Structures are given as structure tokens and as C-alpha cells.
């Protein structure tokens, strides 16, 4: 049987919380509450520890922001959940443009995907959506987020919606994910 120090070392190496090693049965984490984008929009049935820890970190940030907004009696954001999945693509695009107050050809003034992404990120942030971006879990540079597992995810909330973008993606990928998650 491994010693406590060996288990502690294994916990650090794998990124698995130490207490998990002492459970009778492995815990099952529910990730069904969140939708996230993968490459080729594949469904992911067993999210990695890196994804689950990132989700948890973003939930904590969202909860803190929501509590601050509730304390200041901020209104709910009217556009969150305002459009149904059954709407036609053209109607949907119009809704997004109106929400962001941008023209059909907004991207023509941008030099490249990076500039387009930054502009759109600012528009979305100005509406009250928290847009977070990282390529690692927390501050751990050894725990790199895999774009094959997920490119982005959204945590829907009427007061504090949050979009997380995997910064290891290309700028065009980030741009698409940002628009997709805003929707």
C-alpha cells in the first residue's frame, strides 16, 4: 500500500484533490449544467480534471460577481435566455447584432481575427457578460487546457453570465466560440 507522502505526491502530479484518494468510491461530478464547445462539436461524456477544475473556478467567480450585483440591486440582463433554440439563423443573427449594437459588416474595419475577437469581446463585456480566458488551470502552467476537449463554455445566469474561452485556440476559433457561447 502507498504511504501518505506517496499519495500526496500523486495528488500533486495528477491534479486530483488529495481527499479523492481516500473515498470508498470515485466521486461522479455533474457537468450537465454547462454547455461547452469541442473541436467538431463532439459530445464529451467524461470531462477531464482540468476542465472540471476550470468550471469550478469559473463558478466561484460567477457566484462572487452575482452576489456583488445582487448587493447593489442590479437588474437582470434582459437578453439572457431571450432567444429560443428554434429561431431561424437570420433572426438569431439579427438578435445578436441588435444586442451588441453592431452593424452587419462590423468586422470589415478589423485587420484580422485577433482584432475582430478583441472588438467583439469588448462589445460583449460592455453588455455585462463576464468573458474569461486562459489556457491553463488556475495558475498552474503544467495543467494545460486541451482544445480537443473544449474550446469554450458558458455559465448562463440572468445577472452574471460568464463565457470562458480556451486561449490555446486560434483567434478565429476564439471568435467563433465567443459568438457561439454568447448565443
Model-derived regions, located:
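Short juxta-domain linker segments that transition from a proline/glycine-rich
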Residues: 1-183
